[in-house]
């Protein structure tokens, strides 16, 4: 019987809990509902709890309250993805409940599990049952009930695990998509692994590592290194050019399609947004003067910007020769207002930068940046205001969490995809207040539909679509709408579901594995099937996704 848990014993529980999750991270990844090659739940939870474990191992204490503060801080700063943030919040509440204690008894152990659940539910904007939250809630309730019958912490932990497993097995009955795919909730499974490890540590057992101990620094740097090997002379259009034109009554009448067609002859990476009075343009060109002259045919030039991208690239290379990592350069750049974009792929990162993003944090579907990654960039920028573009639904919670931990006034634009991030950033006005930019950038998301093409990593059936491993999949927002072993059939099937008579602009962002012949064929198909839709092409260089699309 174990009636008390002190700091040393709690440290053993944490270490074994982290080890058990690490050993089972691949299993947890495999339970992801959608068969996209992200596998992020197990990875994110593993990185999160490993961050907490490392803090504990470096700051051991006999006091469980002090150790809990250390563990909570490590989890909070290391949290990655929604599952990692929820895990950090569960133990934030747990540790807050014991912060003044040197040791705890069975009843306090149980009440701490419940305190963690209360904290996590408050942290999630729209809690969904059938997830890690449900498993945590049912396990905590079981712990409280068992602690009324016994003073043995081991018995409480055993009962907590048993009920957590029952709850996990019931998740398909609460969440239809789990039942359709035939899996239990991945986050709930990850939490069960942690609790099972807790019991091993509590009873003095050691879980052997199945693989080398995770080195978070090496993994993060390896996954986050997005800087390409492009040569300066390979930059075809060297001037990032932007202008804002106020239409004049005595000037040329504005027709958007004609304007786009004419502007596209000046270069690439063209973006055009207009309302009744103003048109805003972004283009990479060799002749910025000609762009401005053309703009003057329509009215008065309000704002102009030209940046020499070749010179910028030479400066990056110069700094790299001084052994400055690209991420470190981004972090150390100081600005009044930091615009932080989470990005994947050289082309996409360059596009965000050319549009006004001051800092790029590499990351995306396969590697979500941690709360600490985002906090570091904001703090080291020494900004007064910050705008975060997560550009992925799984990075939203860590972005929100980071916003609460910094002194700068910080807002998070709820961008769930790269195309939505681009649309939001295009609405940024440096002369407007943070509140106005937040409003305008968020509103811009309503007019953009996002799509993507990737490949399936397993056989499954979801959203009524039969999917075979290795097939291409077309996703509209996060819903799978088509799957086929023919890439072109998949892409056109997706676009048919996204385009309609109201569609005006289709933006195609080609990934690092995109096929040039298919890309050319795709543009021809769109121009034939949807002649009124203007097509814009960008080389994003993103991994995982052959294509990203936006429809406006």
Curated annotation (Swiss-Prot):
Looking at the record, the residues that make up the DhaL domain are 8-200
Q: InterPro entries from the entry?
A: DegV_domain_contain (IPR050270), DhaL_dom (IPR004007), DhaL_dom_sf (IPR036117), FakA-like_C (IPR033470), FakA-like_M (IPR048394), YloV-like (IPR019986)
A Pfam family found in this protein is FakA-like_C
Molecular function via GO: glycerone kinase activity
Record-level GO BP terms: glycerol metabolic process
NCBIfam families membership: FakA_VfrB, YloV
Protein's name in the database: Uncharacterized protein SH1689
> Where does this protein come from, organism-wise?
Staphylococcus haemolyticus (strain JCSC1435)
């Amino acid at each position: 019987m174990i009636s008390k848990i002190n700091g040393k014993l709690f440290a053993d529980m944490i270490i074994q809990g982290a080890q058990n999750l690490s050993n089972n991270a691949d299993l947890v990844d495999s339970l992801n509902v959608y068969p996209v090659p992200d596998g992020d739940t197990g990875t994110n939870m593993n990185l999160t709890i490993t961050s907490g474990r490392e803090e504990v191992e470096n700051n051991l204490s006999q006091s469980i309250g002090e150790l809990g503060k250390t563990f909570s801080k490590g989890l909070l700063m290391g949290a990655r993805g929604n599952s990692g943030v929820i895990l950090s919040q569960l133990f934030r509440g747990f540790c807050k409940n014991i912060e003044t204690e040197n040791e705890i008894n069975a009843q306090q152990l149980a009440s701490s599990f419940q305190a963690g659940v209360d904290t996590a539910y408050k942290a999630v904007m729209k809690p969904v049952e059938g997830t890690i939250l449900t498993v945590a809630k049912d396990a905590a309730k079981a712990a409280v009930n068992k602690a009324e019958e016994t003073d043995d912490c081991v018995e409480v932990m055993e009962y907590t695990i048993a009920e957590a497993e029952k709850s996990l097995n019931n998740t398909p009955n609460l969440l239809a998509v789990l039942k359709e795919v035939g899996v239990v909730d991945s986050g709930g499974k990850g939490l069960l692994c942690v609790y099972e490890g807790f019991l091993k540590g509590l009873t003095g057992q050691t879980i052997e590592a199945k693989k080398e101990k995770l080195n978070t620094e090496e993994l993060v740097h390896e996954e986050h290194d997005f800087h390409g090997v492009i040569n300066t002379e390979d930059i075809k259009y060297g001037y990032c050019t932007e202008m804002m034109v106020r239409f004049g009554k005595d000037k040329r009448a504005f027709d958007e399609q004609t304007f786009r067609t004419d502007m596209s002859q000046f270069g690439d990476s063209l973006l055009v947004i207009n309302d009744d009075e103003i048109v805003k343009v972004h283009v990479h060109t060799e002749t910025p003067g000609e762009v401005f002259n053309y703009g003057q045919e329509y009215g008065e030039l309000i704002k102009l910007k030209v940046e020499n991208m070749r010179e910028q690239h030479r400066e990056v290379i110069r700094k790299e020769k001084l052994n400055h990592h690209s991420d470190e350069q981004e972090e150390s750049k100081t600005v009044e207002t930091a615009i932080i974009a989470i990005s994947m792929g050289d082309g996409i990162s360059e596009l965000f930068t050319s549009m006004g993003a001051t800092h790029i944090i590499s990351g995306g579907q396969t590697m979500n940046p941690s709360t600490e990654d985002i906090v570091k960039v904001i703090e080291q920028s020494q900004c007064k205001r910050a705008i975060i573009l997560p550009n992925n639904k799984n990075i939203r919670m860590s972005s929100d969490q980071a916003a609460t931990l910094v002194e700068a006034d910080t807002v998070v634009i709820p961008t769930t995809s790269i195309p939505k991030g681009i649309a939001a950033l295009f609405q940024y006005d440096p002369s407007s207040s943070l509140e106005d930019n937040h409003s305008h950038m968020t509103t811009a998301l309503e007019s953009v539909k996002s799509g993507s093409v990737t490949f399936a990593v397993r056989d499954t059936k979801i959203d009524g679509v039969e999917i075979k491993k290795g097939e291409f999949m077309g996703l509209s927002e996060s819903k799978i709408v088509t799957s086929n072993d023919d890439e072109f059939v998949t892409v056109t099937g997706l676009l048919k579901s996204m385009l309609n008579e109201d569609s005006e602009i289709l933006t195609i962002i080609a990934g690092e594995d995109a096929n040039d012949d298919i890309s050319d064929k795709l543009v021809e198909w769109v121009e034939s099937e949807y002649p009124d839709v203007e097509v814009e092409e960008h080389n994003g260089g993103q991994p995982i996704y052959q294509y990203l699309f936006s429809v406006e």
